[in-house]
Amino acid sequence: MLIKYCGIRSKQDIALIEKSAATHIGFIFYPRSKRYVKPERVNEFVTDEIKKQVSLVGVFVNTPVDQILEIASVTNLDVIQCHGQETAADVRQLKQRGYEVWKALPHNKETLQQMHVYEEADGYVIDSKVKEQFGGTGVAFDWSFVPQYESAAQRLGKKCFIAGGINACNIENLLPYQPGAIDISGGIETNGTKDYTKIIEIERKIIL
């Protein structure tokens, strides 16, 4: 299973990730997010060791393409995650610059259709739909839909990350639906700080 821990903001967070089973880590470049990190700070705490262990994902919300590309270059991103209302043309333009691009899609009755609209993306992040919020809500959606999303992504040859409200207390309810990838932020935090105890608790349940 692919595991993305999102909202990484410090040297302390990186130290925890180095001991984890993460395959991807996410940096939030959306100024209105409580987990926002300035792009210039990322290079201060991202080590060569962690770059060998995980892929670096930048999360953007309605950021102009030229600005995304500038930040991606400065922070040496592997993946660009479009988490707002970016268009299929935006995704195409980013891919043309050589980046892996994921599109976040809210869970609703149109999600499967939207997966086809954004079929040029390399992957999807299926998240909860909360009015006027772009991810990081701590709210889970109805996971019985996960097999449909997984099946659609497999047919299109894409990664499919399940996000929204996943934590150590409920991940056992998600696992029977066999997600191929998960994206967790608040679920590995205590009082807004990444918590290694919660990381271990989640990973033990995944492995078992």
UniProtKB/Swiss-Prot annotation:
GO terms for molecular function, please? phosphoribosylanthranilate isomerase activity
Q: Which reaction does it catalyse?
A: N-(5-phospho-beta-D-ribosyl)anthranilate = 1-(2-carboxyphenylamino)-1-deoxy-D-ribulose 5-phosphate
Any one Gene Ontology biological process term?
Answer: L-tryptophan biosynthetic process
Is Amino-acid biosynthesis found in the keyword set?
A: yes
Q: In which pathway does it act?
A: Amino-acid biosynthesis; L-tryptophan biosynthesis; L-tryptophan from chorismate: step 3/5
E.C. designation(s): 5.3.1.24
Query: What protein family does this chain belong to?
Result: Belongs to the TrpF family.
In Swiss-Prot or TrEMBL terms, this protein is called N-(5'-phosphoribosyl)anthranilate isomerase
Species annotation:
Priestia megaterium (strain ATCC 12872 / QMB1551) (Bacillus megaterium)
